[in-house]
UniProtKB/Swiss-Prot annotation:
Taxonomic source organism: Dictyostelium discoideum (Social amoeba)
UniProt entry keywords in alphabetical sequence: Chromatin regulator, Nucleus, Repeat, Transcription, Transcription regulation, WD repeat
Lineage: Eukaryota, Amoebozoa, Evosea, Eumycetozoa, Dictyostelia
Coarse class of the protein's main subcellular location: nucleus
UniProt cross-references to Pfam families, sorted A to Z: Beta-prop_CAF1B_HIR1, Hira, HIRA_B
Keyword Ligase carried by entry: no
PROSITE patterns: WD_REPEATS_1, WD_REPEATS_2, WD_REPEATS_REGION
The name this protein goes by in its record: Protein HIRA
Biased composition annotated in UniProt, kind: Low complexity: 515-545, 649-681
Length: 1114
């Protein structure tokens, strides 16, 4: 086995969301968070000698400025001629290789856009080609799937059965079905003959959570769908769904967190021990950053890699040889693993054996060509035409069952389906063959179409009244260029031979493997403190020892385990490094040399052994907390990150070290001050957590920030996929927009050899400078809105200017250096110091509204940092979101922080993304779910014991939820909805308050909770009965309200507690008028509804005087 980690395969340090290997095995495409598509050569990835050869290109092409947002999916067509990409910009683009290389600069190949598919209303999560290349399917967060034909790339059908975001697709290898998996916790199988739902599978996903992708796959024999994100007995599983009756088969058990991607090898293997036994290989990738390899013939996993990645695995792709594969992760890296035939226990079968295998399952309806590819419905017909009829071939799979299902659905039998089924592939196949031949000729005729010709077929032309034509332009790539099918990337002959011989080592046994590349070292050269960019390699030695099977992994029946292990739910154990000699790692420097001497490396190795299972100390002084045996990318990491502390590459290392020492001194002084002055009224933490600090912004000589007019919470949601990027500043030059703050920092050397920094602030509007100021010091953070802007310097001085450049406030000295500086669109400025204290100023009033309030308490806070911060528009309440996804808002009315996110609430049936509510509360809570998915693996370096001391896992919470009685679940749901109402009030979100009020009313109505409904309605109606009893004695008592004073829970306190007629600007009685029809849906409540309805109508008809209005008029 060989494991490689080429860090030069990168997307600027951002996440890599998709990876796919070309059918010829010599190219691999990646799509990432930088909105780029990159095509790499596989030889340097899979072979060290090719990586070192300067004559072999690594990056073949980088497609830039095409997509506007993150590229979520890249897929090669089955013939390898085209590459499809799907992005957050709602576009699917088709790329082809042009033989016009005149425009090439730094790349080897020229890939141009052949077609742009528009039709989705939201992010495209995955694209997938049909097995016969006749269709391409795209799925999106708009809850739909669009089928496009690949002749002219036009829409064929739009499938809209899903109720939530569609996050994964897989085609039946026989072309009969398409399967899609969605956030609505369902797997839908569609018939490709008429694009109608065949069945919906929901059972394994009822208790599953959410993840950014749900990528299922289909086994090459067509017998099983391997679905993701399954939950079985509070354990995360990969789910096998049988083709025969769409029943749940086996569960692949062992991942600690959700399985988000499954990929099946396209090969069918024959077992070495039993030649008659055939099996398939399945790869699973999870949020626990673990890869697991499974065989359909074994109840246990064949391989587990736990330390290859630091974060969630997003995509996997098999090589065409069936022995190797690549995977990509949210941490922005790619891994390559190559296995030997003996390690998987078999070898791929040939075309003849494959033909016999398929005939046993599907009869003569499926045949195999000379290359081993499936041909559909070719019995007695033309093979070429049958191949092109692929998706519409009617296979005789359970014909009686299918006929009965269609008969029940339609009432009477369909002539087409009846003929197709009864014919058993006879007349039905003939019809499909004719269509297939026609399509085949069309495919041949369009195979030479160029981008310009194809665009002319799709472009829109409008005839104007004057006879002129208006043509809507379509992006077609780079002019008229010939699109050719890419040929395999050539490498020298001696490297081909070396590549062939590199896999000649064979293990001695067929046992499950567990690899942990971060814990197996063989030489001092594998120092984790090295900053080189070499490829990490793990290979088997010539005399491997027998490897211990991984106990908790096993194929699990729905009602029992196959492997008989009683420790089924235990965590996978880590093997002792001292007893494991199966793998070794060595690092090679291909880009730059390490600046550490041997003594430093040895010290780093010792520190790594002692700290590898501890939580990283964010911002602390221990520089060895960044130790990792895997090589890191040479590109800069984001400033705000959960990852370990990095060293600055600028010339200000000494200055930053002095700042860190001063910061530590300040923390110690503050701690002593707090202990010696217990009676001080200042809001200062009595104990500052040891080592807790927030990373300071990266020092740069140019800062530009665009002042955005949209609400801050909306931008926070839009940027949720990049939570670790600095929310305050960007260093990208040439920012466009209406208003820009631009800062240029210069340094001047004085006579005493000291350096003085000056910052020039320019306020630009449509590239026109409105004003300019020059201040002493080095500005680190800027923020503002269209009315004012604020800046802080390295010396911890805060300046605030108005829109004309006049100082509003200046020389404000916070308690420490600032790590965050944020503003809203009105008058509030938020600042967070590096030691975790929050201040909010009202700039218009020139006064502080929150002074040095410590961040909220969190368990293990020293291992967390702030993801982003914001301040609300109306009242200027600070909102802080931590790296674990938890969000808090400070309420001056309560005088404490209020937690917005709720892990138990995430299990509620009402907590779903399928809502049109997009207020600040749902934004923050959705952010919590998405960020926890993206960064779910950030604590992988924490030991199992420390994880147990932290918050309970989702699996345990699910187990707890499942064990609750119906009454307990009702109490939990009621509590969750009441929390939502309270949080909406704290955040002053009136629309969300109304949204949750209606849901709360509906829930109480379904449960027939008369006490809480009466409480709610009485509060919305107001203390009318009590006040009128006092003002009018008993004139309207029981006549108008129908309620006695004792029946009104608010009546006894109505005189002492003033009642407000509005809540968050909404009229309470108008809200009561809206919820009464909901309550009327339960006839048990009709008497109570009638009483409140009568009282409400009395006010509108002036029969009953509104006592609240009477009190106001006095």
């Amino acid at each position: 086995m060989k494991i490689l980690k080429p860090q030069w395969v990168s997307h600027g340090g951002l996440s890599i969301y998709s990876i796919d290997i070309h059918p010829d095995g010599t190219r691999v495409a990646t799509g990432g968070g930088d909105a780029k598509i990159k095509i790499w050569s596989m030889a340097p990835i899979s072979l060290l000698e090719a990586e070192e050869d300067a004559g072999i290109p690594k990056l073949l092409c980088s497609i830039e400025n095409a997509h506007f947002h993150s590229v979520n999916s890249v897929k090669w067509s089955k013939d390898g001629k085209y590459l499809a990409s799907g992005s957050d910009d709602k576009l699917c683009m088709i790329w082809g290789l042009s033989n016009n290389n005149s425009l090439l600069k730094n790349t080897t190949e020229n890939w141009v856009c052949v077609a742009t598919l528009r039709g989705h209303a939201s992010d495209i999560s995955e694209v997938s080609w049909s097995p016969d290349n006749k269709y391409i399917a795209t799925c999106s967060f708009d809850k739909s799937i669009i089928i496009w034909e690949t002749n002219k790339f036009q829409m064929v059908s739009k499938l809209e059965e899903h109720k939530g975001f569609v996050k994964g697709l897989t085609w039946d290898p026989l072309g009969r079905y398409l399967a899609s998996q969605s956030e609505d916790k369902s797997l839908i199988i569609w018939r490709t003959s008429d694009w109608v739902v065949e069945t919906i599978v929901t059972e394994p996903f009822k208790h599953s959570g959410n993840s950014f992708f749900l990528r299922p796959s289909w086994t090459p024999d067509g017998q099983f769908i391997v679905a993701t994100h399954g939950i079985n007995n509070a354990t995360h599983t990969g789910v096998l769904v049988s083709r025969t009756d769409w029943d749940i088969g086996l569960d692949l058990v062992g991942h600690r967190k959700a399985v988000v991607v499954s990929r099946c090898s396209s090969k069918i293997y024959k077992d070495f021990k039993s030649r008659d036994q055939k099996f398939c290989l399945i790869l699973l990738g999870g949020q626990d950053s673990t890869l697991s390899l499974w065989s359909s013939s074994s109840p246990r996993s064949l391989m587990v890699t736990r330390s290859l990645f630091d974060q969630c695995i997003q995509d996997i792709s098999w090589c065409s040889d069936g022995y190797s594969f690549v995977a990509c992760s949210t941490d922005g890296t790619v891994g390559y693993i190559s296995l030997d035939p003996e390690e998987i226990g078999g070898s791929p079968i040939g075309p003849e054996e494959k033909q016999i295998f398929f005939k046993n399952y599907y009869g003569d309806a499926v045949t195999i060509d000379k290359e081993g590819n499936v041909i559909y419905g070719a019995a007695g017909g033309n093979l070429s035409s049958a191949a092109n009829s692929g998706s519409h071939a009617i296979l005789p799979e359970n014909p009686d069952q299918l006929a009965m299902e269609e008969s029940n659905a339609n009432g009477v039998g369909s002539g087409v389906s009846g003929g197709g089924v009864s014919g058993g592939g006879g007349s039905g196949s003939g019809i499909n063959n004719q269509n297939g031949g026609e399509n085949h000729s069309k495919t041949n005729s369009t195979s030479t179409l160029q981008p310009t010709q194809l665009a002319m077929q799709n472009q829109k032309q409008t005839i104007m009244p004057g006879g002129k034509r208006r043509i809507t332009p379509i992006f077609i790539g780079s002019s008229s260029q010939n699109i050719t099918k890419p040929q395999p990337v050539a490498i020298p002959l001696h490297l081909q031979q070396l590549q062939h011989s590199s896999s000649s080592l064979k293990p001695t046994g067929n046992e499950p493997m567990e690899t942990d590349s971060s814990t197996k070292t063989s030489s001092p050269s594998s120092s984790s403190s090295s900053t080189t960019t070499a490829t990490t390699i793990t290979e088997k030695t010539a005399t491997p020892t027998k490897m211990t099977p991984m106990v908790p992994f096993g194929l699990n029946k729905l009602n029992g385990t196959i492997d008989g292990s009683n420790d089924r739910f235990s965590h996978p154990r880590i093997k002792d490094n001292n007893n494991n000699h199966n793998h070794h790692i060595h690092h090679r420097d291909t880009h730059k040399s390490s600046h550490h001497d041997k003594s430093d490396r040895d010290k780093s190795d010792r520190d790594d052994q002692s700290t590898k299972h501890t939580t990283p100390n964010i911002g602390g002084s221990n520089s060895n907390s960044n130790n990792s045996s895997k090589r890191r990318s040479a590109e800069p990491e984001p400033t705000i990150s959960i990852s370990k502390k990095k060293k600055s590459s600028s010339g200000s290392n000494k200055q930053q070290q002095q700042q860190q020492q001063q910061q530590q001194t300040d923390q110690n002084q503050n701690s002593q001050f707090s202990n010696n002055n217990n009676n001080n009224n200042m809001i200062i933490s009595t104990v500052i957590p040891t080592g807790f600090s927030i990373p300071l912004p990266t020092l740069t000589n140019k800062i530009s920030k665009k002042l955005i007019d949209q609400p801050i919470q909306a931008s926070a949601l839009n940027n949720r996929l990049f939570p670790t990027m600095t929310p305050n500043t960007t260093t990208t030059s040439g920012v466009g927009g209406s208003i820009i703050i631009d800062v240029n920092i210069t340094e001047q050397e004085l006579q005493d050899n000291t350096v003085e920094y000056f910052s020039v602030i320019r306020y630009l509007s449509f590239e026109t400078q409105l004003w300019e100021n020059r201040i002493a010091g080095r500005i680190t953070l800027i923020t503002g809105n269209k009315n004012w802007c604020a800046a802080t310097t390295l010396d911890s001085l805060l300046y605030i200017f108005n829109k004309n450049g006049t100082i509003i406030m200046s020389n404000i000295v916070p308690r420490n250096q600032l790590s965050f500086l944020e503003s809203n669109k009105t008058n509030h400025l938020l600042a967070i110091t590096c030691d975790g204290f929050v201040c909010v100023w009202n700039v218009l009033k020139k006064k502080v509204e929150l002074s040095n309030r410590e961040l909220p308490f969190l368990k293990n806070r020293d291992s967390l940092t702030i993801k982003h911060a914001m301040v609300t528009e109306e009242s200027g309440k600070p909102i802080i979101t931590f790296s674990n996804g938890d969000s808090f808002v400070y309420s001056s009315d309560v005088g404490e922080w209020v937690k917005i996110t709720d892990r138990l609430g995430a299990l509620s049936e009402y907590n779903s993304n399928d809502t049109t509510n997009t207020g600040i509360l749902s934004t923050l809570q959705n952010n919590n779910r998405i960020n926890s998915i993206i960064n779910s693996n950030i604590t992988n370096n924490i030991s199992n014991q420390q994880q147990q001391q932290q918050q309970p896992s989702v699996s345990n919470l699910l187990s707890l939820s499942n064990s609750e009685s119906q009454q307990q679940q009702q109490l939990s749901t009621s509590l969750f909805l009441e929390k939502q109402l309270w949080l909406a009030q704290v955040l002053e979100s009136s629309l969300e308050y109304k949204h949750w009020l209606l849901i709360y009313t509906k829930y109480l109505t379904n449960c027939c909770n008369i006490v809480k409904l009466t409480d709610l309605c009485t509060d919305l109606l107001g203390p009318s009965s009590t006040l009128n009893d006092h003002h009018h004695h008993h004139h309207h008592h029981n006549h108008t309200t129908g309620m006695s004073m004792e029946s009104n829970p608010f009546s006894n306190n109505s005189l002492s507690i003033p009642w407000e007629s509005t809540i968050l600007g909404l009229s309470k009685r108008s809200l009561l008028k809206e919820i009464l029809p909901i309550m009327a849906g339960n006839r048990t409540l009709q008497r109570m509804v009638g009483q409140f309805k009568e009282s409400l109508n009395a006010f509108s008809k002036n029969i009953l005087v509104d006592p609240f209005d009477t009190l106001l008029n006095k």
